[in-house]
From Swiss-Prot:
<keyword id="KW-0372">Hormone</keyword>
<dbReference type="GO" id="GO:0007186">
    <property type="term" value="P:G protein-coupled receptor signaling pathway"/>
</dbReference>
<keyword id="KW-0964">Secreted</keyword>
<feature type="glycosylation site" description="N-linked (GlcNAc...) asparagine">
    <location>
        <position position="106"/>
    </location>
</feature>
<feature type="disulfide bond">
    <location>
        <begin position="87"/>
        <end position="115"/>
    </location>
</feature>
<keyword id="KW-0325">Glycoprotein</keyword>
<dbReference type="GO" id="GO:0016914">
    <property type="term" value="C:follicle-stimulating hormone complex"/>
</dbReference>
<comment type="function">
    <text>Shared alpha chain of the active heterodimeric glycoprotein hormones thyrotropin/thyroid stimulating hormone/TSH, lutropin/luteinizing hormone/LH and follitropin/follicle stimulating hormone/FSH. These hormones bind specific receptors on target cells that in turn activate downstream signaling pathways.</text>
</comment>
<feature type="signal peptide">
    <location>
        <begin position="1"/>
        <end position="24"/>
    </location>
</feature>
<dbReference type="GO" id="GO:0010469">
    <property type="term" value="P:regulation of signaling receptor activity"/>
</dbReference>
<comment type="subunit">
    <text>Heterodimer. The active hormones thyrotropin, lutropin and follitropin are heterodimers composed of CGA, a common alpha chain described here and a unique beta chain which confers their biological specificity to the hormones: TSHB for thyrotropin, LHB for lutropin and FSHB for follitropin.</text>
</comment>
<dbReference type="GO" id="GO:0016913">
    <property type="term" value="F:follicle-stimulating hormone activity"/>
</dbReference>
<dbReference type="InterPro" id="IPR029034">
    <property type="entry name" value="Cystine-knot_cytokine"/>
</dbReference>
<dbReference type="GO" id="GO:0005615">
    <property type="term" value="C:extracellular space"/>
</dbReference>
<dbReference type="GO" id="GO:0006590">
    <property type="term" value="P:thyroid hormone generation"/>
</dbReference>
<feature type="disulfide bond">
    <location>
        <begin position="38"/>
        <end position="88"/>
    </location>
</feature>
<feature type="disulfide bond">
    <location>
        <begin position="56"/>
        <end position="110"/>
    </location>
</feature>
Amino acid sequence: MDYYRKYAAVFLVMLSMFLHSLHSLPDGDLIIQGCPECKLKENKYFSRLGNPVYQCMGCCFSRAYPTPARSKKTMLVPKNITSEATCCVAKSFTKTTVLGYARVENHTECHCSTCYYHKV
C-alpha cells in the first residue's frame, strides 16, 4: 500500500508543478519569445463584428549608456545614465465611435518614433 502512496504523491507533486507553470505563462503567443515587431493588432475590447478597431503594438529601439562627462556639465540635474528610445506609434489613424458614445483612434499604419507617453 505504501508503494502506491509514494507514486500518488509524486504524481500529484508533478501535476501541481505542471499546472503552476502552465498558469504562469502569458496569455496567447506561447511560441513567440521576446518582443514582437511594431505592427497593427486588433483591439478585442473595442472591436465589434464588422467594425474592427486596431492599435499599434510591439517593440522598437531602446538603449541606455553612461552619460558622457561633457554632457553632465550642461545638465541642471546631472544623471549618470542616459537613455534613448523610440516607441511604436500610429503613423496615421481615423476617429471612430465605439460602444455608441466613446470616440477612439483606429490606427491604420504604425512606425517607430518619439515616445510621447512613458510609464513611470
